[in-house]
A protein has these predicted regions:
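RNase H-like nuclease fold core
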Residues: 1-64, 76, 157, 161
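Alpha-helix termini
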Residues: 22, 32, 77-83, 105, 121-126
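C-terminal functional segments of enzyme domains
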Residues: 15-18, 86-90, 94-163
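Phosphate/oxyanion-binding active-site loops and adjacent basic polyanion-contact surfaces
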Residues: 62-70, 107-111
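Metal-dependent nuclease catalytic cores in nucleic-acid-processing enzymes
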Residues: 65-83
Length: 163
């Protein structure tokens, strides 16, 4: 059994609410040299019409971007893990962990729809019981030691399209 560490981030790119979100993710082998080895990565910009058409979101928000980042990561990186492997999603938005584990109640219908799509993807891939979520404190200066800080900063730049 292997463990795959996936770092995801979402960003509300347009603070004037013109409907632009960025999502980014990286899958790493943390036992590789240095901070680990990149196995795959993605960076996507999403428009308001995508969010509305797929999730019924009438507005773009940072929480929705964070969750869509998780959904994209599960779809993008599924080719890496097998039926017995463990997957850990690392995100700097606490809502990812709390909503996905049921500790927070979802109030917005579009957030519930995104979570439902993530749940469907987990079922489709058979990841139940093998997927966990870790919260990473965001926006920290890299200390040269902690891989969580390193990779979180990396996916933050992917989500903002500055890789």
């Amino acid at each position: 059994m292997k463990q795959f560490d996936v770092y995801t981030d979402g960003s509300h790119l347009d603070k004037q609410n013109n409907g632009r979100l960025g999502v980014g993710g990286v899958i790493v082998n943390l036992s590789g040299p240095g901070m680990g080895t990149i196995l795959g990565k993605f960076s996507n910009e999403l428009k308001q019409d995508y969010m509305y058409d797929n999730f019924g979101a009438s507005k773009c928000s940072n929480p929705s971007a964070e969750l869509v980042g998780v959904l994209f990561a599960l779809r993008e990186f599924s080719k890496f893990w097998g039926p017995l492997d463990k997957v850990v999603i690392h995100a700097d938005y606490l809502g990812v962990k709390e909503w996905m584990t049921g500790k927070w109640r979802i109030k917005e219908p579009y957030i519930a729809k995104i979570k439902s799509e993530i749940d469907k993807e987990i079922m489709k891939q058979g990841l139940q019981g093998r997927l966990s979520y870790e919260w990473v404190k965001g926006h920290q200066k890299f200390d040269g030691v902690n891989p969580d800080i390193y990779w979180n900063n990396y996916v933050d730049s992917l989500a903002k399209g500055i890789d």
